[in-house]
């Protein structure tokens, strides 16, 4: 018997029998380098090549279409923002463990302040109704002495720990505390508020206290006006619910909290508007000019 024929086919390791589907795998030998003959050979077929060529051609067509779209967008007129089609919007997913620096373009943006047409003016000027100011008299005060010796002064420590003093011109009210701090309310203008605070400080000086006039500051201004038409408050609170609250069972007015300027508006169905929270007069005017176009959009037609 021939020795070569006695070896099994897998031990010969030279070639597979004729007609076999896979090439022969050489047996491992200590003399052979590691990995020799174990690397599979790529099998190329005409079908796989045609599929790759088709995919490359489709990618080239898509890149050409995107480049032409971007060129048309850059050639647009100034002032117009080019918009991408929905199929071309970019969506980026953050890597795991990281937070995205910029919001996704598909995320809806939250408006901060209502848009105001620059060309439209209301022609209405809100009137100041009350100004609250504070001043430091710079000394400790005996409230009992002030209440007993001063005119138009009342003091009830069980009810409120301050002397309540009033003057007729300007018609205002002052709250005087034992620490020397004083709050003046009721003035109709900034000048009246300062004048009234100086008069209260002079009264305290005449009672024998070394009062000064320090750190005068206006803390709040209240204005009001009338737009002369009824307003649909239900529609306004639905459209601007992130700024407003309306509970007619608790309070008849809609409370609108404007972000810039930081003003709180009380809007009533009759068209009356109250603005509060301003530090300067210009904030009252700016807030009303911002809200007036919105109120016109919710004008009640009867």
From Swiss-Prot:
Keywords (A to Z) from UniProt: DNA-binding, Nucleus, Repeat, Transcription
Compartment annotation: Nucleus
Organism: Gallus gallus
Role of this protein: General transcription factor that functions at the core of the DNA-binding multiprotein factor TFIID. Binding of TFIID to the TATA box is the initial transcriptional step of the pre-initiation complex (PIC), playing a role in the activation of eukaryotic genes transcribed by RNA polymerase II.
Record GO terms (molecular function): DNA binding; RNA polymerase II general transcription initiation factor activity; RNA polymerase III general transcription initiation factor activity
Name this polypeptide is given: TATA-box-binding protein
Low complexity bias spans: 57-81, 89-101, 109-119
Assembly and binders: Belongs to the TFIID complex together with the TBP-associated factors (TAFs). Binds DNA as monomer.
């Amino acid at each position: 018997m021939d020795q070569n024929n006695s070896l099994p086919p897998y031990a010969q390791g030279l070639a597979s029998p004729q007609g076999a589907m896979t090439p022969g795998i050489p047996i491992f030998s200590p003399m052979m380098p590691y990995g020799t003959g174990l690397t599979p050979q790529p099998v190329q077929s005409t079908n796989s090549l045609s599929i790759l060529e088709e995919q490359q051609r489709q990618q080239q067509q898509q890149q050409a279409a995107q480049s032409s779209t971007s060129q048309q967008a850059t050639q647009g007129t100034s002032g117009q923002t080019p918009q991408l089609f929905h199929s071309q919007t970019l969506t980026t997913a953050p890597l795991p463990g990281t937070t995205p620096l910029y919001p996704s373009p598909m995320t809806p943006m939250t408006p901060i302040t209502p848009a105001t047409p620059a060309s439209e003016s209301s022609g209405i000027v809100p009137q100041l109704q009350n100004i609250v100011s504070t001043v430091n008299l710079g000394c400790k005060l005996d409230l009992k002495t002030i209440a007993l010796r001063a005119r138009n002064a009342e003091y009830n420590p069980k009810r409120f720990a301050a002397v309540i003093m009033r003057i007729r011109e300007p018609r205002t009210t002052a709250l005087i505390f034992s620490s020397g701090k004083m709050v003046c309310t009721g003035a109709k203008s900034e000048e009246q508020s300062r004048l009234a605070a100086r008069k209260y400080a002079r009264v305290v000086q005449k009672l024998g206290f070394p009062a000064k006039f320090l750190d005068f500051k206006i803390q709040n201004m209240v204005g009001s006006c009338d737009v002369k038409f009824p307003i649909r408050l239900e529609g306004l609170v639905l459209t601007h619910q992130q700024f407003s609250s309306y509970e007619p069972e608790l309070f008849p007015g809609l409370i609108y909290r404007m972000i810039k300027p930081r003003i709180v508006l009380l809007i009533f169905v009759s068209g009356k508007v109250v603005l509060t929270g301003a530090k300067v007069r210009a904030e009252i005017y700016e807030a009303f000019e911002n809200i007036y176009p919105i109120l016109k959009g919710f004008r009640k037609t009867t």
